[in-house]
UniProtKB/Swiss-Prot annotation:
<feature type="binding site">
    <location>
        <position position="13"/>
    </location>
    <ligand>
        <name>Mn(2+)</name>
    </ligand>
</feature>
<dbReference type="InterPro" id="IPR036230">
    <property type="entry name" value="LeuA_allosteric_dom_sf"/>
</dbReference>
<comment type="subunit">
    <text>Homodimer.</text>
</comment>
<protein>
    <recommendedName>
        <fullName>2-isopropylmalate synthase</fullName>
        <ecNumber>2.3.3.13</ecNumber>
    </recommendedName>
</protein>
<dbReference type="Pfam" id="PF08502">
    <property type="entry name" value="LeuA_dimer"/>
</dbReference>
<dbReference type="InterPro" id="IPR005671">
    <property type="entry name" value="LeuA_bact_synth"/>
</dbReference>
<dbReference type="InterPro" id="IPR013785">
    <property type="entry name" value="Aldolase_TIM"/>
</dbReference>
<feature type="binding site">
    <location>
        <position position="201"/>
    </location>
    <ligand>
        <name>Mn(2+)</name>
    </ligand>
</feature>
<comment type="pathway">
    <text>Amino-acid biosynthesis; L-leucine biosynthesis; L-leucine from 3-methyl-2-oxobutanoate: step 1/4.</text>
</comment>
<dbReference type="GO" id="GO:0030145">
    <property type="term" value="F:manganese ion binding"/>
</dbReference>
<dbReference type="Pfam" id="PF22617">
    <property type="entry name" value="HCS_D2"/>
</dbReference>
<keyword id="KW-0028">Amino-acid biosynthesis</keyword>
<feature type="binding site">
    <location>
        <position position="203"/>
    </location>
    <ligand>
        <name>Mn(2+)</name>
    </ligand>
</feature>
<dbReference type="GO" id="GO:0009098">
    <property type="term" value="P:L-leucine biosynthetic process"/>
</dbReference>
<comment type="function">
    <text>Catalyzes the condensation of the acetyl group of acetyl-CoA with 3-methyl-2-oxobutanoate (2-ketoisovalerate) to form 3-carboxy-3-hydroxy-4-methylpentanoate (2-isopropylmalate).</text>
</comment>
<keyword id="KW-0100">Branched-chain amino acid biosynthesis</keyword>
<keyword id="KW-0808">Transferase</keyword>
Length: 518
């Protein structure tokens, strides 16, 4: 059976989702989970786009050992050089170069002729091949490119040294038959096509990204580019979990499969959802909360008699299992450590002690600790930079039906250890909290989005708050988790501000290095 390579673009195309702003620690956490999932290639970012992205890609490339790490680059020597510097220490460095090929892009964006685009594509593939053992070349907007011209340029970049050819449906325009036909046409009209792997990259603007990806496989694609939970530009990318399970369950139809560890899908989905702040719809295939729920009486009756009557996928296949162990205030260190191991976390004794102390503090507020609670607890500690910005200390809010909500907040400036306390009022309790935080922080901050959701079921479930703010005109997002909604709201606000302060600090450092170098 044919093996399909899985090229995950959660950290590059996925992070381009509106409102998503991952820091380097969060990107590394996702990359490590993608490695556990068993993807073949991780597209870690766009190294030339910013100093922060460069450093994140570099750290991921140096850390990940069991899959290839790649970065995106325009057909520009500076982009290729930046990608090489970021990726050269990786296990199997590769680059992903792109240039638009459709007439609409050539005319309105590139202002180039077809011949000029061909020359540039060939030149940049040759340049990249001098450094990278594997060069992937993408024809941006291939779906709206005339097939004879697409075949011409594909043939020439293969001769120039490309190892993988990506034919993306950049705007999610094609039907499955139309998209599959592009791969069939390349197989039939490009003489040297057998020297490369063909890759599919589909967007979901018309809701056909997964179907188009499967059609590409049926017509010769060797690699699928996708993102966890289908996140990405506009309506998103093809959902990795849907393609992977479709190949596994229906390999009789597709005659192909991946080598993913499917039992890691649910955990990966949850991690990406938590860190990006993009909630997974309850009815989302494979990983949604309702994916394995049966409510209709007729369905329940059949399911109880024989699961296969209404269930084509077992929950265990994708890592959806009932908690084998309920943790609470009387749970010991051994049970706690065992649960962390089950969840895929490996820590030394000092880290176990630190997290166990945090766990015990949580049990004083919450009767039963779920897997989601543990994951949230650990992630907040692992991915937060505690050297820059403000640390939340305490919050007190007075409000009632006949009172003006008043909040008092205590913070610590983590750079100079200065303690600060302020109070302010607001039209509501959340506004009072944010007005108070605004008085503590000497920045022009504006709240542009606020969302709240429960971590799971139950009256004592942890609250998760996601916010988007502008800090001195620069957009940033943040999240906070606590049992109290107002505390979670305060932490989310500070998290967003601190993220921007970290970015500003990195940028200032880069400017100083540049000034010294010049």
């Amino acid at each position: 059976m044919r093996k399909i390579n899985v090229f995950d673009t959660t950290l590059r195309d996925g992070e381009q989702s509106p409102g998503v702003n991952l820091n380097s620690r969060e990107k590394l956490a996702i990359a490590k989970q993608l490695e556990r999932l068993g993807v073949d290639i991780i597209e870690a970012g766009f190294p030339a786009s910013s100093r922060g992205d460069f450093l994140a890609v570099q750290e991921i490339a140096r850390t990940i050992k069991n899959c290839s790490v790649t970065g995106l680059a325009r057909s520009v020597k500076g982009d290729i050089d930046a990608a090489w510097e970021a990726l050269k220490d990786g296990v199997s460095p590769r680059i992903h170069i792109f240039i638009a090929t459709s007439d609409i892009h050539l005319k309105h964006k590139l202002k180039m002729t077809r011949e000029e685009v061909k020359e540039k594509a060939v030149e940049m593939v040759k340049y990249a091949k001098e450094r990278f053992p594997i060069v992937q070349w993408s024809a941006e907007d291939a779906c709206r490119t005339e097939l004879p011209f697409l075949a011409e340029i594909v043939e020439e970049v293969i001769d120039a040294g490309a190892s993988v050819i990506n034919l993306p449906d950049t705007v999610g325009y094609l039907t499955p038959d139309e998209y599959g036909n592009i791969f069939k046409y390349m197989k039939e009209h490009v003489p040297n096509i057998s020297r490369v792997k063909l890759s599919a990259h589909c967007h979901d603007d018309l809701g056909m990204a997964v179907a188009n990806s499967l059609s590409a496989i049926e017509n010769g694609a060797d690699q699928i580019e996708c993102a966890i939970n289908g996140i990405g530009e506009r309506a998103g990318n093809a959902a990795l979990e849907e393609i992977a399970v479709a190949l596994h369950v229906r390999n009789d139809a597709h005659q192909a499969d991946s080598s993913l560890n499917l039992h890691e899908l649910k955990r990966t989905s949850d991690l990406v959802s938590k860190l990006t702040g993009m909630a997974v719809p309850r009815n989302k295939a494979i990983v949604g909360d309702n994916a394995f729920a049966h409510e209709s009486g007729i369905h329940q009756d059949g399911f109880l008699k024989e699961k296969s009557t209404y269930e084509i996928i077992s929950p265990e296949l994708v890592g959806v299992t009932a908690d084998a162990l309920v943790l609470g205030k009387h749970s010991g260190r051994h049970a706690f450590k065992d649960r962390l191991n089950t969840l895929g976390f490996q820590f030394d004794s000092d880290e176990i002690n630190k997290y166990f102390t945090m766990f015990k503090e949580l049990t004083e507020k919450k009767k039963e600790i779920t897997d989601d609670d543990l994951i949230s607890l650990i992630l907040e500690e692992k991915v937060t930079d505690k050297k820059i910005g403000y640390e939340f200390l305490s919050l007190q809010v007075h409000y009632g039906t006949s009172q003006v909500p008043t909040a008092t907040v205590s913070l610590k400036n983590q750079e100079n250890e200065q303690l600060m306390q302020e109070a302010a009022t607001g039209a509501g309790s959340v506004e009072a909290v944010y007005n108070t935080l605004g008085r503590c922080i000497d920045k022009n901050i504006e709240l542009t989005d606020y969302r709240i959701q429960s971590n799971r079921k139950g009256e004592d479930a942890l609250a998760q708050v996601f916010v988007r703010v502008t800090v001195n005109g620069k957009e940033s997002s943040g999240r906070g988790i606590a049992q109290d909604v107002l505390e979670a709201s305060a932490k989310a606000y500070l998290n967003a501000v601190n993220r921007q302060l970290v970015l500003d600090c990195n940028l200032d450092g880069l400017k100083r290095q540049t000034a010294v170098g010049s």
